[in-house]
Amino acid sequence: MCIRDRNVLQFLFYDGDSVDNIEENTVLYTGTHDNDTSIGWFESLNNKLSSDEINDLKDILNSDSKGMNWSMIEYSFQARAKTVIVPVQDILGLGSDSRMNTPGTISENNWSWRMDSSELKDTMLRKMRDITEEANRA
């Protein structure tokens, strides 16, 4: 099977699109190494969107107290895309300070983020397992 398209969830929202329009033969990312973490991205929206637009986004993602990172992961896993890729920073629920790279910049922060294995908790692994099973991706 040839993968012919890739989409980044954060960009879909900027384009006014939804995962409903994603075809099966697609790779869907919550984010990549070149854009902000899901938490960092969502927090940055306070400066870009009205409170009504932010509430609309929360409604689309069915976001509640579980955290925006988990809402974006669940939303992605419900898409028809054959493959969904989630950066570990999103699983860990980390913010902009854990961003991997900022394209077009020269910074000591680029490519310097490292994960300590103790950061990945059993509860996070169980949550990913549950999301995977609920989306019939197991």
Where do the protein language model's features map onto the residues?
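Carbohydrate-interacting/catalytic domains
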Residues: 7-16, 22-23, 36-138
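Short, small-residue-biased leader/transition segments that mark boundaries at the very start
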Residues: 1-3
